[in-house]
Structures are given as structure tokens and as C-alpha cells.
A protein has these predicted regions:
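Short, contiguous acidic/charged loop-to-helix segments that flank catalytic cores in large enzymes
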Residues: 23-35, 51-55, 72-79
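Extended, hydrophobic/aromatic-rich amphipathic alpha-helical segments that build helical scaffolds
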Residues: 33-65, 84-96
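Long, intrinsically disordered, low-complexity segments
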Residues: 28, 32-33, 67, 76-150
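Intrinsically disordered, low-complexity segments enriched in glycine/proline and serine/threonine
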Residues: 5, 15-16, 50, 135-136, ...
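Flexible, polar/acidic helix-loop-strand segments at domain edges
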Residues: 1, 6-37
Length: 150
């Protein structure tokens, strides 16, 4: 998988400049770099904690760290369902343009509903493409050969 590298010093840290395919004009690398941000860890924790135990102080603390950083008020006193919705909103806001929204919707079980509504409103001719058959990606062939039970 390729990762496009920007010209900023922050982006260059992900680049292996010694690779043959790297040049000033083509700032790409074939390195696969899994990235997990602290915000992801906080949201994963808050979501899991809320599902297991409801909105605990620890779950609120995790979400509120992100909200304070963004200049927003702390959350408190929410029901489990309302806190779940708040966490989902934080995921959406925190990961905008990171191409993981689809995966979150699938995990939350809301992908088909949300996407059908979106396509019906914006591209009604394409709503027929939002189907359960297209919900999950196929298992990679290599993995299927190793484990035929997939």
C-alpha cells in the first residue's frame, strides 16, 4: 500500500527516503505503516467501556480529553444509548477524511441505513448499490488458502 507524503516535516517522518522509488518529484513509499493515534485509543476505550459497563467515569474521561482539546464542553450524565451516540459523533468528527467512517458504520450496524439515506437524498439512482452483499470485503485469497474455514 502506498502512502502519499506531503512536503511538510510532519509528513516526511513516514517516508523511507533511502528507497529506490523515492524521489523529490514522487514522494511516495511502498512501506505499509499502520497508524493508530492516541485519539483512536481513547475512543476505542470509551466505546468498549460504555458497551460493557455503561457511561463510567473512565469512559467520560477518555471522550472528554478529546473534547477539551477541541475546545468543547465535557460530557456527563448521559444514558448508555445517548453516550453511545455521543461517542459515535466523536469518532465521526475526530476521524474526518481518514477513510474509516465506513468501517465504523459497519461495526455499529448502521451502514446500510445511513448509506441508503445518503444515496437516496444525493444519488437516488445509485441507492440500489447499497446492499448487504457489499457490506463486507472478501477475505484475501492468501488468507483463504491458509485457513479454508474463512
Amino acid at each position: 500500500s502506498e502512502m502519499c507524503i506531503r512536503d511538510s516535516p510532519h509528513g516526511k517522518k513516514w517516508c523511507d527516503g533511502g528507497r529506490e522509488n523515492f524521489s523529490q518529484r514522487n514522494k511516495r513509499t511502498d512501506m505499509y505503516i499502520p497508524i493508530i493515534r492516541y485519539a483512536d485509543v481513547l475512543l476505542i476505550f470509551a466505546e468498549a467501556e460504555n458497551e460493557a459497563n455503561g457511561p463510567t467515569a473512565a469512559a467520560y474521561d477518555a471522550v472528554n480529553q478529546l473534547r477539551v482539546r477541541a475546545g468543547l464542553d465535557n460530557l456527563s450524565g448521559l444514558s448508555k444509548e445517548t453516550f453511545r451516540q455521543a461517542i459515535q459523533k466523536e469518532w465521526t468528527l475526530e476521524t474526518t477524511h481518514e477513510r474509516i467512517y465506513r468501517f465504523n458504520l459497519v461495526r455499529w450496524g448502521t451502514y446500510l441505513t445511513v448509506m441508503k439515506e445518503y444515496f437516496q437524498k444525493n444519488f437516488p439512482e445509485k441507492v440500489k448499490n447499497v446492499t448487504e452483499e457489499r457490506l463486507y470485503f472478501p477475505c484475501p485469497e492468501h488468507d483463504s488458502l491458509i485457513n479454508p474455514n474463512l
